[in-house]
UniProtKB/Swiss-Prot annotation:
HAMAP family hit by this protein: Ribosomal_uS3_B
This protein's encoding gene: rpsC
Summary of the function given for this chain in its UniProt record: Binds the lower part of the 30S subunit head. Binds mRNA in the 70S ribosome, positioning it for translation.
Transmembrane segments: none
Pfam families noted in UniProt: KH_2 (PF07650), Ribosomal_S3_C (PF00189)
One of the GO biological process terms: translation
NCBIfam families with a match to the protein in the record: rpsC_bact (TIGR01009)
Protein name according to UniProt: Small ribosomal subunit protein uS3
């Protein structure tokens, strides 16, 4: 039976960057890794309603720089920047180093696999039919320019006695092509019948030379003006 490698792990350093970029001595590595885990856990808990896509952590010159990619930057920043200042103090306390927090807005949340997976999980928790939630997510992604998308949900779908897996795909999702920009994420929906797992793969185009390739617009038809 064929098994699938993790789409993000196999592309690290090729077409996908790391979520933490820092170097450390052998003595400090474990402490830094643990503080990274604590920071991510804290931020995901505090910002669970802020549509956070991913959290990138840098450690320049004995300080910590956290970049939060979110579709709702206003929720993270708060009134006059009060909320982000509280987060900065807490992150500095967790890491034991001066902290800086940057906010990066996700312009198209429909093309971000983590936000799509969280959205589907939220709909399942609100008792929306799983097929409707899946189909809506697929249609939105294709409409906004995705080359392909696959959505998979597994668990006691619709309250069934026996757990099963259902998936829906549209377009191309080439998992073996390393230059393919595949965005993969998972989420969980806590329903009254148990946990339902959600997986999302989004193919956003091919990456050449470290940057996503952009399709040139077709030339407009008409008379040439001299």
């Amino acid at each position: 039976m064929g098994q699938k490698v993790h789409p993000n792990g196999i592309r690290l350093g090729i077409s996908r960057p790391w979520n933490a970029t820092w170097y450390a001595n052998t003595n400090e590595f474990a402490d830094n890794l643990h503080s990274d885990f604590q920071v991510r856990k804290f931020l995901n808990k505090e910002l669970r309603n802020a549509s956070v896509s991913r959290i990138v952590i840098d450690r320049p010159a004995k300080s910590v720089r956290v970049t939060i990619h979110t579709a709702r930057p206003g929720v993270v920043i708060g009134k006059k920047g009060e909320d982000v200042e509280k987060l900065r103090k807490q992150v500095s306390k967790l890491t034991g180093a001066p902290a800086q927090i940057n906010i990066s807005e996700v312009r198209k949340p429909e093309l971000d696999s983590q936000l799509v997976a969280d959205n589907i999980a939220g709909q399942l928790e609100r008792r929306v039919m799983f097929r409707r939630a899946m189909k809506r997510a697929v249609q939105n992604a294709i409409r906004l320019g995705a080359k392909g998308i696959k959505v998979e949900v597994s668990g006691r779908l619709g309250g069934a006695e026996i757990a099963r897996t259902e998936w829906y795909r549209e377009g191309r999702v080439p998992l073996h092509t390393l230059r393919a920009d595949i965005d993969y994420s998972t989420s969980e929906a806590n329903t009254t019948y148990g946990i339902i797992g959600v997986k999302v793969w989004i193919f956003r185009g091919e990456v050449l030379g470290g940057l996503p390739t952009e399709e040139k617009p077709a030339p407009k038809r008409g008379k040439n003006r001299k």
